[in-house]
Amino acid sequence: MESENNSVKSKSISRKKKIHNNSNDLEIDPKVTPINVSELEQIQRDQLIVIAEEKAVDFAENLSKQELIYNILKKQSEKNGAIIAGGVLTVVEDGFGFLRSNKLVPGPSDVYVSQSQIRKLGLRSGDYVVGLVRSPKDQEKYYGLLRVERVNDMTSEEAKRRPNFEDLTPIFPDEKITLETDKPNDSLSQRIVDIFSPVGKGQRALIVSPPKAGKTMLLKSIANGITSNNKDVHLMVLLIGERPEEVTDMRRSVEGEVIASTFDEPVEDHTRVTEVALERAKRLVEAGTDVVILMDSVTRLARAYNL
């Protein structure tokens, strides 16, 4: 996605690209391999140490994972190499925003997005934005977004033409979501839901049962049925107040996007993550994607809003 206030010029002498963004100039050397921040965050610490040593980072073995990423990006900036970052946009009350990829909560790897970029490109909370960023300057806390490449896997012009979620017309469900699969561990519960309580696209459903009755197991079974039989559906599993090990188990069991705020995190994170996840789903619907949100649990979310 291209930002209209960014222009790219080439110099035949230095063979570098000069990018202008809000009066900030950055020299990009095409000979230096670009680094993707999101990919670095997925790499294990041992592999990061190898990359850091290749970048000549001092005392790499003594650094934490977050410190390794920071120093790798710092060395990349010193060599005028491109840094690519992506995350879900959160717009604050003052009009500017942040790209967040780590559990959708504030963190040191957030990318600052200016108010002018948000207005000019029509960005909204919940957009997944990928772009070129720069390292923090003196007395700055966050990376800065220089140029937007993609928004929800669309170009900037395509993103500008998308409708608003509030302007879409709600209709009754007219397409069934089939859950039954050939997996023996899941097929019985999936078939029972298909027969006695069929679910359609656009429908809301609530699972009510006492504690320890197997709601989470049923939720995983439903999630696997959705991903197996409905490849065009984007599945989001939202876990609020769960134990960290249950979140890990869900991520290993389900192919969809798992978003979580565990019980040991502040209640403010519970509400913030829920609201950002809902905005993320709206942006996907605006792009023409069918979205299913499975949340566990409504009780803990209501408790978080009441505290």
Describe the role of every protein-language-model region.
Residues 67-69, 80-95, 135, 139-152, ...:
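Glycine/charge-rich, flexible interdomain linkers and switch-proximal surface loops
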Residues 252-259, 263, 267-307:
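Conserved P-loop NTPase nucleotide-binding/switch module
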Residues 171-172, 177-274:
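Phosphate-binding glycine-rich loops and their immediate beta-loop-alpha structural context
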Residues 123, 134-207:
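P-loop NTP-binding catalytic core
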Residues 104, 117, 133-139, 211-212:
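Short, charged beta-turn/beta-strand-edge "cap" motif at the junction between a beta-strand
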Residues 1-113:
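Charged, low-complexity terminal tails
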Residues 117-130:
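Short nucleic-acid-contacting surface segments enriched for D/E, G, S/T with interspersed K/R
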Residues 48, 68, 97, 114, ...:
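Residue-level signature of catalytic and energy-coupling elements of molecular machines
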